[in-house]
Amino acid sequence: MLSALASTIILAAAASFAAALPTATADGASKCTTPEKRKSWHDVSESDKKAYLNAVKCVMTSPQKLNRLPGAKTRWDELVSLHQIHALQIHTTGQFLPYHRYYLKTLDFLLRECGLPKEVTLPYWDEPRDAGKFSKSPVFDKVLGFGGSGVGAQSCVMDGPFANLTVNIGPGFKTQPRCLNRKITDFLSSSCGASYVTSAISGSTYKQALDAIYSGPHLYGHMALSMMNGDSITSSGDPVFFLHHGFVDKMWADWQAKDLTKRLKDISGLNAQDPAVGFSEFSGGMEVESAMWGKPGQELLAVTPDPKSGDGGGTITLNHIMSSLGIIPNATVADVMDIKGGYLCYEYA
């Protein structure tokens, strides 16, 4: 549980960020006439795969720019740090789906900054096609993918474009450089199958969809990759994270599409974790989880936005303000509800 001092630091930092960053996006009112098509990695052309992988590697080697995020040396570090800083606000909360949709937009910006051509769109991973056999997926190809399971006691990834990668952010709330580690467990990936996805998006309310997606295919997708993906704080250190969350975002979009008029406004849940619950995938609440991941120190707390920003209370609203800490302008939950609403302009193929 955060101390009174920590809460004070967070509120002070929130005021600072509110002054330094836009509180709403200007392009949300623009028209979406030709939505880009996001494809599963299975269906991305060889040339587009190469362009995407090269852009990711460019982000990983580009110097950091914000000069405020603890441990960040590169633009990729800043992206991972963003997830670390917001971890207790965007998991087991109503923010989970909208924030990760915004997070994908943040990645897209960084990739374009590194020269990713406009015609190459963010890929996702159609996980039902590989359910039960993740290790055989083209996602883990050694040339046109992200490399496979790691080796040795730490399961360090030693093949593919990201072999021998050093991850500077994490584990947990720490900043201890380590290898990119991954250990694929096929039987766990069975819970990402088509029947599980159908069940996850069968509910009639946002809360039902949120809970089912989070604790179902989302959670099992991470668990099936183990190691870094088992670290809910800094799992985005593995670039496969973003393909997985593209799949998660597609599930939400598919659920919304079933009753679009109603569901584009359906949002609910807390805007920060209940300390007694913490991450729903672990029992014991925050105090128990801190034994695994530690607690955010004052440096992290000093750059952590107010989880109630735009809401006026502890429940998330469409007015909730999401921050990338300066990588891209702030956005509201309302901005990201419609993937073809103007602020966003894409669809899933």
Where are these regions (language model features)?
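Intrinsically disordered, flexible peripheral segments
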Residues: 21-349
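Fungal secretory targeting signals
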Residues: 1-26
